[in-house]
């Protein structure tokens, strides 16, 4: 199934039913009085997180959704039926944004979470509501109010604890295949990974974490080059980022420059994401001698001013991967426990995630704006060239041969 992580849609809540104007008419009962009932409330529109979904592709083909309107009231004080609510299923991890105000309406991060996105209209009032001691036969009713209309954007961000960063062919997908049951495509050419993939890493029974792989970044990604920039937003929910560096690239490029390029692109994309806890992992260490690996490690430390630990693995042969996953899970469990014990810390983490997501949206919107401007300029140049050709046709000389 095609992976779609963004979808703009229109939602329309149902209109409230109108109130009824009616008077009681029965044999032997004179001046029976008003008995017009109220209308029914309009249906509302909700989004509900469904753990069985993993893409927003269905919302690419249908963009408008409308809840049922309430029925009008009837005589004998009968109230109209309420309009049925419309519940739209979305994947877990979906953020909802009001496209008019650019305000984040809410996040659906757990299966079963439900979010109101369009409130149904209020029911109208029948003429029985307006009866009083001075107005025994009111001919006044109140119509139901209109339901709320909204244009919203759905943004899916995968829910993972650990996110993978690296250039194409650094071995990110191989790492996920080696530590989990996930089977992302692996090949010896760049951009094998085209969409994010998730893997559940089970260290022990009932002890696990989720790792996410996104398409590789290249130099200039923050300016729109390559595939990875639009998927970086999926890392905003990750607690730890793994920066995977190929110590022996097949194209003979410098591992030091590769590591520096990723750091630069992250800084340009989102300063807050760049401050996220990041673990540096050297991959394919089995292709070099210990002294050569040590030299690469020394150069990377100097180039990045790296003071933390550097882990050395060979994902294809599972060398060092089990120890790395054990340390990752142990650290994650400490972070999770701190947030459970300290609500203020959990709230700070939530604010940091919101800030990263906002920066990601702004950067992607800027790149889209640049792309549209460049496309329009190219189209304009093409039209100018066509006009020049037409002018040349009008100015060409015609010679008649006698």
From Swiss-Prot:
GO molecular function terms listed in the Swiss-Prot or TrEMBL record: GTP binding; GTPase activity; magnesium ion binding
InterPro entries for this protein: G_OBG, GTP-bd, GTP-bd_Obg/CgtA, GTP1-OBG_CS, GTP1_OBG_dom, GTP1_OBG_dom_sf, OBG_GTPase, P-loop_NTPase
Biased composition (Acidic residues): 385-395
Protein name per its UniProtKB record: GTPase Obg
EC number, UniProt record: 3.6.5.-
Segments of this protein annotated with the region Disordered: 376-402
GO cellular component: cytoplasm
Domain Obg: 1-159
Subunit structure and binding partners: Monomer.
Pfam hit, one: GTP1_OBG
Any one of the GO BP annotations: ribosome biogenesis
């Amino acid at each position: 199934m095609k992976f779609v992580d963004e979808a703009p849609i229109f939602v329309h809540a149902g209109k409230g039913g109108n109130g009824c104007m009616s008077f009681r008419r029965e044999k032997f009962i004179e001046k029976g009085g008003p008995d017009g009932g109220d209308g029914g409330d309009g249906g509302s529109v909700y989004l509900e997180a469904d753990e069985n979904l993993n893409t927003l592709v269905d919302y690419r083909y249908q963009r408008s959704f409308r809840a049922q309107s309430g029925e009008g009231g009837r005589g004998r004080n009968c109230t109209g039926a309420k309009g049925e609510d419309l519940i739209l299923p979305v994947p877990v991890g979906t953020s909802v944004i009001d496209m008019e105000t650019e305000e984040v309406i809410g996040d659906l991060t757990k299966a079963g979470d439900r979010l109101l996105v369009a409130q149904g209209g209020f029911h109208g009032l029948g003429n029985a509501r307006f009866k009083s001691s001075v107005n025994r036969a009111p001919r006044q009713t109140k119509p139901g109010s209109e339901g709320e209309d909204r244009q919203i954007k759905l943004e899916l961000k995968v829910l993972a604890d650990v996110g993978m960063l690296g250039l194409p062919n650094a071995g990110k997908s191989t790492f996920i295949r080696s530590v989990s049951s996930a089977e992302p495509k692996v090949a010896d050419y760049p951009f094998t990974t085209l969409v994010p993939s998730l893997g559940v890493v089970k260290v022990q029974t009932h002890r696990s974490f989720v790792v996410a792989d996104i398409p590789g970044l290249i130099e200039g990604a923050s300016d729109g080059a390559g595939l990875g920039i639009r998927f970086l937003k999926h890392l905003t929910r990750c607690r730890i980022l793994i920066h995977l560096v190929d110590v022996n690239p097949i194209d003979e490029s410098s591992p030091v420059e590769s590591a520096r390029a990723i750091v630069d692109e992250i800084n340009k994309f989102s300063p807050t994401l760049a401050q996220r806890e990041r673990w540096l992992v050297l991959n394919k260490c089995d292709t070099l001698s210990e002294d050569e690996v040590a030299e690469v490690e020394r150069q990377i430390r100097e180039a990045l001013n790296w003071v933390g630990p550097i882990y050395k693995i060979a994902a294809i042969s599972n060398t060092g991967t089990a120890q790395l996953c054990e340390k990752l899970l142990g650290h994650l469990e400490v972070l999770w426990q701190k947030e459970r014990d300290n609500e203020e810390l959990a709230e700070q983490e939530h604010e940091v995630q919101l800030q990263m997501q906002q920066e990601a949206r702004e950067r992607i919107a800027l790149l889209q704006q640049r792309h549209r401007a460049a496309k329009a300029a190219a189209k304009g140049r093409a039209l100018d060239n066509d006009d020049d050709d037409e002018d040349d046709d009008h100015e060409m000389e015609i010679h008649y041969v006698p």
